[in-house]
């Protein structure tokens, strides 16, 4: 049987993956309408804690935190103590040279994105990553947006652009690789 989708990348591992959190900010969170805020925050924090437990490089950004959208949500800051957030003004996080440099400095070729909003903050840099030769994944349950149409069309656009859409837990469990690992309880 021949697969209908020839895009079947090599598995994510602790040596090839990094996580990029884009604009998980207080002001943007208040407009989320496609997901329960409590569940969305749970998924964002779970992704952050799993990334830390697996020793994955993490890049975090905010946009216009002083003028438009406020700081990163406190729950994400607490899950990533000591993490610096790159505050920028560009719509596409990748267009800020500091963000691009931070992503490239991870040395990883598989990038997991989570952001508010899904169709802009997570999607734009993920699509750019694909164009730049990276494999990009969007953890759709760690992303939110402002209505269901934006969510549905955003996921379609991501898939059409070569970005893999999947849930955060599946990504981190794939990276974990072995339930006998002492890191397993922190990942699950």
Regions found by a protein language model. Give the residues of each.
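Generic recognition of short, well-ordered alpha-helical segments
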Residues: 71, 98, 124, 149-153
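Active-site-proximal flexible loops/turns
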Residues: 30-32, 122-124, 148
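Short gly/pro/ser/thr-enriched loop/turn and capping motifs at secondary-structure boundaries
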Residues: 92-93, 119-120, 143-148, 172-173
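Active-site acidic carboxylates
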Residues: 1-90, 105, 135-138, 152-159, ...
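Internal catalytic-core helix/loop-beta-alpha segment
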Residues: 88-131
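A short glycine-rich beta-strand->turn/loop micro-motif centered on a GG-aromatic cluster
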Residues: 112-115, 134-148
């Amino acid at each position: 049987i021949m697969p209908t989708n020839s895009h079947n990348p090599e598995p994510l591992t602790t040596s090839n993956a990094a996580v990029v959190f884009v604009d998980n900010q207080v002001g943007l969170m208040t407009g989320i309408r496609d997901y329960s805020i409590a569940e969305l925050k749970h998924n964002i924090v779970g992704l952050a804690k799993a990334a830390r437990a697996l020793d994955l490089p993490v890049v975090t950004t905010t946009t216009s935190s002083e003028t438009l959208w406020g700081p990163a949500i406190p729950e994400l800051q607490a899950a990533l103590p000591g993490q610096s957030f790159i505050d920028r003004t560009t719509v596409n996080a990748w267009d800020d040279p500091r963000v691009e440099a931070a992503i490239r400095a991870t040395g990883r070729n598989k990038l997991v994105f989570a952001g508010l909003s899904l169709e802009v903050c997570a999607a734009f840099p993920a699509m750019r990553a694909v164009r730049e030769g990276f494999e990009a994944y969007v953890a759709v349950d760690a992303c939110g947006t402002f209505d269901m149409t934006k969510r549905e069309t955003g996921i379609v656009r991501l898939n059409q652009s070569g970005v893999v859409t999947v849930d955060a837990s599946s990504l981190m469990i794939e990276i974990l690789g072995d339930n006998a690992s002492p890191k397993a309880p922190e990942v699950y």
